[in-house]
UniProtKB/Swiss-Prot annotation:
Pathway: Cofactor biosynthesis; thiamine diphosphate biosynthesis
Any one cellular-component term (Gene Ontology): cytoplasm
SUPFAM superfamilies: ThiG-like
Native source organism of the sequence: Erwinia amylovora (Fire blight bacteria)
HAMAP family: ThiG (MF_00443)
Reaction catalysis annotation: [ThiS sulfur-carrier protein]-C-terminal-Gly-aminoethanethioate + 2-iminoacetate + 1-deoxy-D-xylulose 5-phosphate = [ThiS sulfur-carrier protein]-C-terminal Gly-Gly + 2-[(2R,5Z)-2-carboxy-4-methylthiazol-5(2H)-ylidene]ethyl phosphate + 2 H2O + H(+)
Gene that encodes it: thiG
Subunit and interaction comment: Homotetramer. Forms heterodimers with either ThiH or ThiS.
GO molecular function: thiazole synthase activity
Function per UniProt: Catalyzes the rearrangement of 1-deoxy-D-xylulose 5-phosphate (DXP) to produce the thiazole phosphate moiety of thiamine. Sulfur is provided by the thiocarboxylate moiety of the carrier protein ThiS. In vitro, sulfur can be provided by H(2)S.
Name of the molecule in the record: Thiazole synthase
BP GO terms, sorted: thiamine diphosphate biosynthetic process
Compartments, as annotated in UniProt: Cytoplasm
Lineage of origin: Bacteria, Pseudomonadati, Pseudomonadota, Gammaproteobacteria, Enterobacterales
Assigned keywords, A-Z: Cytoplasm, Plasmid, Schiff base, Thiamine biosynthesis, Transferase
């Protein structure tokens, strides 16, 4: 489903901002996630220890270009990530607005085109804009990662109708909600809408109990997916009686 990989879990988890490496490891294991995102900014003085932890966890690593604001920065970071982690996967972020951390659509498409042409399998962090989505697919991306809300905001699905339109328009394209999810109920809602996965970080890393929150999100994402698969009833403006009137007592 995600390029050459079909995960059992639809929960993708970030690795930044945890209280300790031990809690990070416990949260990843509790989440059941098979894909974890990693920033090259972690590769400082303790980079070796962090890579050792990644090896121990035996998860699929999705490096990202977090913090990049230009095409050159993002492309250079992607090449470094491919060399360091020995993977063609890259979560492409090209930030265009400092306050909202909204992606720069023009730089994002250009960077995606360059990387896809060189064999990368790009996971683009984008918005719910349909035209931008089309341009990213034309550039060579095989999936899209629209935000639910600004990164780390915890606002959930801020533009539900826009996301519904995106899901409806890109029927056969894997769509992963990336950013803005703050509560398990929000993740379940996205899965009920038909999205293919949830990527989050802050909601688990900053929770009072990251282990418990990782478990809660795993359950919610699974429940939302199962509900969608089972077939949700249509919403109605008026009540519809669920109890049949046949056989009711007749009073005279």
């Amino acid at each position: 489903m995600f390029y050459d990989f079909v995960p059992q879990s639809r929960f993708l988890l970030g690795t930044a901002g945890y209280p300790s490496p031990q809690i990070l490891q416990q949260a990843i294991e509790a989440s059941g996630s098979e894909i974890i995102t990693v920033s090259l900014r972690r590769e400082g003085s303790q980079g070796g220890a962090f890579r050792a932890l990644l090896t121990q966890l035996n998860k699929r690593v999705l490096p990202n270009t977090a913090g990049c604001h230009t095409v050159k920065e993002a492309v250079t970071t992607a090449y470094m990530a491919r060399e360091l982690f020995n993977t063609r996967w890259i979560k492409l972020e090209v930030i265009g607005h400092a306050d909202t951390l909204q992606p720069d659509p023009f730089a994002l498409v250009e960077a995606a085109r360059i990387l896809c042409a060189d064999g990368f399998q790009v996971f683009p962090y984008t918005t719910e804009d349909l035209i931008l989505g089309e341009k990213l697919l034309e550039a060579g991306c095989k999936l899209l990662m629209p935000w639910g809300a600004p990164i780390g905001s915890g606002q959930g699905l801020r533009n539900i109708e826009g996301l519904r339109s995106m899901r409806s328009w890109f029927k056969d394209i894997p769509l992963i909600i990336d950013a803005g999810i703050g509560a398990p109920s929000q993740a379940a809602q996205a899965m009920e809408m038909g999205f293919d996965g949830i990527l989050l970080n802050t909601a688990v890393a900053r929770a009072q109990d990251p282990l418990g929150m990782a478990q809660a999100f795993a359950s919610a994402i699974r429940a939302g997916y199962d509900a969608r698969s089972a077939g949700l009833i249509e919403r109605r403006d008026m009540a519809t009686a669920s109890t049949p009137i046949f056989g009711m007592a007749q009073f005279s």
